[in-house]
């Protein structure tokens, strides 16, 4: 291969690399960004899933539910302090994603709960899941498993910051 062709191919790869590193999904008016989870310990039966959902449309949508072949059940949960104690509860009726707004599912707040894990989540794994929306319908995503101490998505090797 000629050097000029190699340089052109390398430059094209560098330009294309950032979108590949920042994994996410576009589905109609919804942009689902950085789905991630934490590594789980052997024998641990549950794990959390986190992401952002931006609604670029003019109509509200709702995240109704989720499924995954990696878990017996997947639920939408919220965490909040009640009487000085942090409690986790299942959300019924889904979560609104307002027109022009963003819903953030993050540690300590709303999140996806993978229950009855079929095997431990290991760092580097990509956990397949399907999110179900009121308007958009079913959307396939993959949660990138990060180290157990992560507090935010790691993209492109920049750590949990």
Give residue spans per PLM region.
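Compact, glycine-rich, soluble single-domain proteins
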Residues: 23-126, 130-161
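N-terminal signal peptide c-region/cleavage motif recognized by signal peptidases
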Residues: 16-17
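Bacterial N-terminal signal peptides that target proteins for export
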Residues: 1-9
């Amino acid at each position: 291969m000629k050097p000029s062709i190699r340089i052109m191919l390398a430059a094209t790869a560098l330009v294309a690399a950032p979108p590949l590193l920042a994994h996410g999904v576009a589905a109609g008016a919804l942009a689902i960004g950085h789905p991630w989870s934490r590594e789980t310990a052997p024998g641990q039966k549950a794990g959390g899933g986190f992401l952002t959902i931006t609604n670029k449309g003019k109509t509200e949508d709702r995240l109704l539910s989720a499924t995954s072949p990696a878990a017996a059940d997947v639920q939408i949960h919220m965490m909040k302090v009640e009487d000085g104690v942090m409690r986790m509860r299942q959300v019924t009726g889904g979560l609104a994603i307002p027109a022009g707004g963003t819903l953030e599912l993050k540690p300590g707040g709303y999140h996806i709960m993978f229950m009855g894990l079929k095997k431990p989540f290991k760092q580097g794994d990509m956990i397949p899941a399907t999110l179900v929306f009121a308007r958009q319908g079913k959307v396939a995503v993959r949660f990138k498993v990060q180290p157990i101490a992560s507090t935010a998505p790691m993209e492109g090797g920049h750590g949990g910051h």
